[in-house]
């Protein structure tokens, strides 16, 4: 059943609003993936703070027009699933990458981050971005290592100074 104009406008407005607040987007082809697997993916997406939607390609072109994701327009060919990361830039890429490992039919087409098109070959860079908590933990570990190293150097300097006396 075809959508009427008001329904199309409502879909475009809803998805465009999400796109404006999103940090990154990933586009995939879902041909051959079962409904049960897609339902599992949707559930995982909700838990990860990822907005997923299957939208007609013509409507998706309208959605991404004049947004950071305009570079994705050429990827809207065939059945298209788009996911917007709203909390962490790598969330959708990580989710799709893990799902693609388990489902060979699932094909990631491309991603966009900060207005830049990221080809499939470089999706790993986006997927492996640390979360906020991971980044803070790494920073704290680095600072802790620096403090220990500084203490060791100070003690070595004191020892050398005492030996010189």
Curated annotation (Swiss-Prot):
The keyword Ribosomal protein applies. The keyword Ribonucleoprotein applies. Forms part of the ribosomal stalk, playing a central role in the interaction of the ribosome with GTP-bound translation factors. SUPFAM superfamilies: Ribosomal protein L10-like (SSF160369). NCBIfam families: PRK00099.1-1. Part of the ribosomal stalk of the 50S ribosomal subunit. The N-terminus interacts with L11 and the large rRNA to form the base of the stalk. The C-terminus forms an elongated spine to which L12 dimers bind in a sequential fashion forming a multimeric L10(L12)X complex. Keywords: Ribonucleoprotein, Ribosomal protein, RNA-binding, rRNA-binding. The gene is rplJ. PANTHER family: 39S RIBOSOMAL PROTEIN L10, MITOCHONDRIAL. GO terms for molecular function: large ribosomal subunit rRNA binding; structural constituent of ribosome. GO terms for cellular component: large ribosomal subunit. Transmembrane segments: none annotated. Pfam families: Ribosomal_L10. InterPro entries: Ribosomal_uL10, Ribosomal_uL10-like_sf, Ribosomal_uL10_bac, Ribosomal_uL10_bac_type, Ribosomal_uL10_CS_bac. GO terms for biological process: translation. Belongs to the universal ribosomal protein uL10 family. This is Large ribosomal subunit protein uL10.
